[in-house]
Amino acid sequence: MCTSIIEVTKAEGMAKRGDEWFPLSHAVVAYDHARHANLGDVITLDFINAVLEPGARAGIELTLETAKELRAALDRAIAAADFEEAEVRGKGAAPVIVRAA
């Protein structure tokens, strides 16, 4: 199945390939059949540097369920980091907690 589900975003950070780290320029998220994992359709994450050689890539293939769990973990970590930045370091507005009536 070729789904043509592809999202590309700029990325700032570092990725490791073998023993070496390289700077990132982009991240690609796709949903398609696995190329390497012995799985069906997968979420593929590719972290790349478009200016370096084609091997400047770190790729991951995840089941859809694992990708959802990773997204939830990222959401929790990002929320905690936002709180840390606002509350502890005084950067940005403090998060607002809305209580149900």
Which residues fall in each region the model found?
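Positively charged, low-complexity terminal tracts
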Residues: M1-A101
